[in-house]
Regions:
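Bacterial N-terminal signal peptides
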Residues: 12-23
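Beta-rich, blade/repeat-based domains predominating
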Residues: 45-62, 88-109, 114, 131-159, ...
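Short loop/turn segments that connect beta-strands within beta-propeller blades
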Residues: 76-81, 119-123, 165-169, 208-211, ...
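Beta-propeller fold detector
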Residues: 42, 83-87, 126-130, 173-176, ...
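Beta-propeller domains
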Residues: 64-83
């Protein structure tokens, strides 16, 4: 702001400055939250130790599994308050969650070898996909076409699989000879599938064909220590990687360069999503304290953007 020349101009500028100062003092103007600094969203212990699978809707709410007790999905509001949104069928326990649109969500049931579809208005739950040859499944990723990809680890044997779930709900095993497949994500252009192997400490990249099959397996990133869990992309194709055991989340460029490392206030972050009202809040499921933590980011999340009305 520039103030010069005549007295009347000076008085006008002083008046504007006073209005701005009063607004700041009265709380009308609020400084933006700093980026990549984690703070708690919920109270300690509102989830079980199975807290996982965060996903964000268009209204700024966050959904995560095992709220209050196993077998539930909780809905957490932007102020940190929450409620049980749905109870999964008896014996089922959820893990990864993905929104297909503003009308339904998909939930990986790692006990019953299912992927559920939950209608958001009615909260009705149906089996979208089932295969007895699945170990779990664990986490989910969605292509622009609506095709789902599921990671499927066998923790006891140290092995894992990748599945493609078509629009008709039919599951096709793409790879059956991998390590402990866990975090999974599709790039913004739908051409690359990322899959993390937790125990092996590696993230693989695959090319995605026009038919949804994957090929061209290659190392995207390796780690010398600790595990890794959830993967999520922003609109620019940067990956957010939860480092289970390290207590951090990495922001990684599409070329594999680490851009940010965020301390998330607990040693065992299990998964992450990007959402909030503007798509620029990261929500992390934090196992050590059984809570959600949050931090602001510089670019909106990919899944959040896809939910926006066109």
């Amino acid at each position: 702001m520039r103030c010069r020349q005549r007295f009347s101009s000076t008085v006008g500028c002083i008046t504007v400055l006073l209005v701005v100062m009063v607004g700041v003092v009265s709380g009308q103007a609020v400084a933006p939250s700093p980026l990549f600094i984690a703070t708690p969203l919920t109270q300690v212990g509102v989830f079980t130790s199975g807290i996982e699978g965060p996903a964000c809707d268009v209204d700024g709410n966050v959904y995560a599994v095992n709220y209050e007790r196993q077998g539930t999905i909780g809905r957490i509001r932007p102020d940190g308050s929450g409620e049980i949104y749905v109870e999964l069928p008896q014996g089922s326990v959820g893990n990864g969650i993905r929104f297909g649109s503003q009308r339904e969500m998909y939930v990986a049931d790692y006990v019953g070898h299912n992927v559920f579809e939950v209608q958001l208005r009615s909260r009705a739950i149906t089996i979208y996909s089932h295969d007895d040859n699945m170990n779990q499944p664990n986490d989910l990723a969605m292509a622009p076409s609506g095709v789902l990809y599921a990671s499927d680890p066998n923790w006891a044997e140290g092995s894992g699989q990748i599945w493609r779930i078509g629009l008709d709900g039919n599951a096709t095993r793409l790879f059956g000879d991998m390590g402990t497949t866990n975090g999974i994500e599709v790039s913004p252009d739908g051409r690359t599938l990322y899959v993390g192997e937790s125990d092996e400490r590696v993230i693989w990249a695959f090319d995605i064909g026009v038919d949804g099959t994957v090929f061209g397996k290659r190392v995207f990133m390796r780690f010398a220590d600790h595990g890794l869990d959830g993967l999520r992309s922003d609109v620019d194709g940067n990956l957010y990687v939860t480092r289970y055991g390290a207590g951090t989340v990495l922001k990684v460029s599409p070329s594999g360069r680490i851009l940010q490392e965020v301390n998330v206030l607990g040693a065992r972050p299990s998964n992450i999503c990007l959402g909030g009202m503007d798509g620029r809040t990261a929500y992390v499921t934090e196992v050590e304290h059984r809570r959600l933590v949050q931090f602001r980011v510089d670019r909106p999340g990919l899944a959040w953007q896809r939910l926006r009305p066109e």
